[in-house]
Amino acid sequence: MAKRNVTAKKKVVKKNIARGVVYISATFNNTNITITDEMGNVICWSTAGGLGFKGSKKSTPYAAQQAVESALSKAKEHGVKEVGIKVQGPGSGRETAIKSVGATEGIKVLWIKDITPLPHNGCRPPKRRRV
């Protein structure tokens, strides 16, 4: 019988970071939350799909709220107390995600920016759906 090669999981090193940036990427299908330090190094992240929401439930505002709460609870373990928010995308979880960051106890929101890319008449958009 052959020996199985088992790799050990990486141990998460607790960082002591007081100020961070929350990136909220709200697409039509999912919501991604990434929390970084001020230099852009990722502290933790969470997605609606990663929390067990499948299919069309991933794009709901409730799923976005749960993703934010999951990511911020991980960030609090690293000592994050103040955050800025950068929002990208047109998804339905966008507003709810911003509100739930502000409502989280122990986290102070310093600023909110919209970083959604807008084309200056760039690529031709895809044709309209006919249902």
Curated annotation (Swiss-Prot):
Family: Belongs to the universal ribosomal protein uS11 family.
NCBIfam families in the cross-refs: PRK05309.1, uS11_bact
Keywords, in A-Z order: Ribonucleoprotein, Ribosomal protein, RNA-binding, rRNA-binding
Top-level taxon of the source organism: Bacteria
HAMAP family: Ribosomal_uS11
Protein name, UniProt field: Small ribosomal subunit protein uS11
GO molecular-function term, one example from the UniProt record: rRNA binding
Subunit structure and binding partners: Part of the 30S ribosomal subunit. Interacts with proteins S7 and S18. Binds to IF-3.
Cited Gene3D superfamilies: Ribosomal protein S11
GO BP term, pick one: translation
